[in-house]
Amino acid sequence: MDRYSRNMEMLTLEENISLRSKKIAVIGCGGLGGYILEMLARLGVGTLAVADGDVFEESNLNRQLSSDTGVIGKNKALQAKIRISTINPDTEVIAFDRNLTAENAREILSGCDIAMDALDGVGSRLVLQQACEDMEIPMVHGAISGWYGQVST
């Protein structure tokens, strides 16, 4: 538990242990999603289901954690899995190298305790919201643009 000793200032031992059994979906692995994924892994979440059909571009280098010059053209979800494995090998990452759609949402969200929206489009966000409602999975919405951000549940 030494890895998580600083968590004890905000979470109880039982809550820390509980995180290991949680499965959280993070949909969108770019700017916001990369930070969410990294913090959840550092916090000690047991399983992360990540989905993103996009690839890294040079314009991502200044703001996306999983990007570097060696991953240009590579899928964001697959690269997030690699990065998380070096940060916390105890966190299992199930990576989907495709965008969430109405057709694949059930597969991606299966068994998740909560879904994190880190998407950059309203259409895909509505698909996620509907799937979460249908599957009775709580959803946390997040968005950023420049110096502004928003979060809601």
Task: Walk through the language-model features, giving the residues of each.
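N-terminal charged helix/coil linker that caps or initiates catalytic domains
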Residues: M1-A25
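Short acidic active-site motifs
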Residues: E14-E15, E103-E107
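Conserved N-terminal Rossmann-fold NAD(P)-binding element of oxidoreductases
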Residues: V26-G28, A51
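Hydrophobic/small residue at the entry helix of a nucleotide-binding pocket
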Residues: L32-G33
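Hydrophobic residues within alpha-helices
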Residues: I36-L37, A80
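Aromatic pocket-lining residues of Rossmann-like dinucleotide-binding sites
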Residues: L40
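Glycine-rich phosphate-binding loop and adjoining beta1-alpha1-beta2 segment
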Residues: V45, V50-N88
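E1/E1-like adenylate-forming module used to activate ubiquitin-like modifiers
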Residues: A95, L100, G111-T153
